[in-house]
């Protein structure tokens, strides 16, 4: 993106007709920023889950150990499905940025895309992971685990971090939606499990 020149960006003010680097084009910048944001978010979540795994195995306090184990159990199907789906999205966007050249073997993007394509399939397909989340993990301990997770997130968003304050209100609204969804799912798990088949499809998406 910093080497290839093609077309004129919307901000091109030159009068000589020269093409711009493709990184100057708004859609390319948006794609690169989206990829960067996803990767950094995935890394943060992966590090946190790895830490919880260590705590669940080695902590001396049994309550802390069990709480960490609950978090690992809840988030494992989420992380597996989320990371593999987003991995496909990122490699697809990378190929798009390279253009037709990205479709060839020269740059290796097509190989990365092919390698990523297996990840939603193995270690339990993502639809199986979604069903596990909806049928078992959300209702585990009568929803206490998912509520603990949501409370943990809320405690972070309600901290005194000035950088995230502009986003806190909207983010908390999404947390409430997620909480209502989990409560609805737990209720249906007792009365109408068939409808949860459709819910698991939504969770997979």
Residue positions per predicted region:
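Terminal amphipathic helices with adjacent charged low-complexity linkers/tails
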Residues: 13-14, 21-28
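Long, well-ordered alpha-helical segments
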Residues: 1-18, 38-60, 83-98, 136-188
């Amino acid at each position: 993106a910093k080497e290839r020149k093609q077309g004129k960006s919307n901000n091109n003010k030159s009068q000589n007709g020269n093409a711009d680097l493709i990184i100057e084009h708004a859609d390319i910048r948006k794609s690169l920023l989206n990829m960067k944001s996803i990767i950094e978010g995935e890394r943060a979540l992966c590090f946190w889950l790895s830490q919880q795994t260590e705590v669940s195995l080695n902590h001396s306090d049994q309550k802390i150990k069990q709480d960490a184990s609950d978090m690992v159990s809840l988030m494992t199907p989420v992380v597996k499905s989320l990371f593999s789906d987003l991995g496909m999205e990122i490699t697809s966007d990378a190929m798009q940025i390279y253009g037709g050249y990205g479709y060839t073997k020269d740059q290796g993007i097509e190989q990365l895309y092919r390698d990523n394509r297996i990840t939603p399939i193995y270690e339990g397909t993502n639809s199986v992971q979604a069903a596990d989340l909806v049928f078992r993990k959300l209702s585990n301990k009568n929803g206490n685990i998912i509520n603990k997770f949501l409370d943990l997130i809320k405690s972070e968003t309600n901290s005194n971090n000035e950088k995230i304050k502009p986003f806190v209100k909207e983010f908390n609204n999404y947390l409430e939606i997620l909480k209502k969804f989990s409560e609805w799912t737990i209720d249906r798990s007792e009365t109408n499990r068939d409808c949860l088949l459709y819910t698991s499809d939504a969770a997979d998406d």
